[in-house]
């Protein structure tokens, strides 16, 4: 299976076009006001129309209520909802029932105990995203540019696909993929020149590095007896 590359926190037509032309599989749009990447619905509608089926559209939310989710879905028409807050298993189940969209649940990781509830989340989500657990007093649940110990995911066994996030950049994505064997990588701050400001060259470099990491891993595993 091919490695999924997601560029998250896109907010301008030009950087979205760069991500699409460089071959991103998923493009993420943030709907969380404390984030410098937050989008108003009118802008989200414009950017969503620009995608035109060239990549999967992902709406990132955190503990959003039904009214908020309804507005986001109407504006963006996402292919996937990324739940990046403290959504419970019953809440995830309710969101899927009400809106009929697949869900990717973000799991904050710092220590092995943070993975204890994986079976419960895997039973209701369609995909998992492992991100660094934010510091105690952080105002945002992600996009902080901080990695976690990827070795915690070594030999991970879950029944649904998972992606990796948290502190990824062109310079470390090869190690990240090799250690975790993640099915996808998700980057935001690692392709920015300033918080919320995507850098076209960094976006291209990351996607290129992720594809190279995918090739290296495939070649390495093909030689395992």
Swiss-Prot record:
Reactions the enzyme catalyzes: N-(5-phospho-beta-D-ribosyl)anthranilate = 1-(2-carboxyphenylamino)-1-deoxy-D-ribulose 5-phosphate
InterPro entries membership: Aldolase_TIM, PRAI_dom, RibuloseP-bd_barrel, TrpF_fam
Any one Pfam family match given in the protein's UniProt record, by short name: PRAI
Assigned keywords, A-Z: Amino-acid biosynthesis, Aromatic amino acid biosynthesis, Isomerase, Tryptophan biosynthesis
Keyword Isomerase appears in the UniProt entry: yes
Molecular functions per Gene Ontology: phosphoribosylanthranilate isomerase activity
Biological pathway: Amino-acid biosynthesis; L-tryptophan biosynthesis; L-tryptophan from chorismate: step 3/5
UniProt KW Amino-acid biosynthesis keyword: yes
Class of the enzyme per the UniProt entry, highest EC level: isomerase
Domain of life: Bacteria
Biological process annotations from GO: L-tryptophan biosynthetic process
EC number: 5.3.1.24
Family named by the database record: Belongs to the TrpF family.
Record-given protein name: N-(5'-phosphoribosyl)anthranilate isomerase
Organism: Nitrobacter winogradskyi (strain ATCC 25391 / DSM 10237 / CIP 104748 / NCIMB 11846 / Nb-255)
């Amino acid at each position: 299976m091919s490695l999924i590359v997601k560029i998250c926190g896109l907010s301008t037509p030009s950087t979205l076009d760069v991500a699409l032309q460089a071959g991103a599989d998923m493009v993420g749009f943030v709907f969380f006001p404390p984030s410098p990447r937050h989008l108003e619905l009118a802008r989200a509608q414009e950017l969503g129309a620009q995608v035109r089926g060239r990549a999967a559209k992902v709406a990132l939310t955190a503990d959003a209520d039904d009214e908020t989710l309804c507005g986001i879905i109407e504006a963006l028409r996402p292919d996937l909802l990324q739940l990046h807050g403290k959504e419970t298993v019953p809440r995830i189940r309710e969101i899927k029932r009400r809106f009929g969209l697949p869900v990717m649940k973000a799991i904050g990781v710092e220590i092995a105990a943070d993975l204890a509830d994986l079976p419960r989340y895997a039973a209701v989500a369609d995909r998992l995203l492992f991100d660094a657990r934010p510091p105690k007093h952080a105002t945002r649940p992600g996009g902080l540019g901080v990695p976690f110990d990827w070795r915690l995911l070594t030999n991970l066994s879950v029944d649904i696909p998972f992606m990796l996030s948290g502190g990824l950049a062109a310079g470390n994505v090869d190690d990240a993929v090799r250690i975790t064997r993640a099915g996808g990588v998700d980057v935001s701050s690692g392709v920015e020149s300033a918080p919320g400001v995507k850098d076209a060259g960094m976006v291209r470099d990351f996607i290129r590095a992720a594809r190279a990491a995918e090739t290296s891993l495939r070649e390495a595993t093909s030689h395992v007896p």
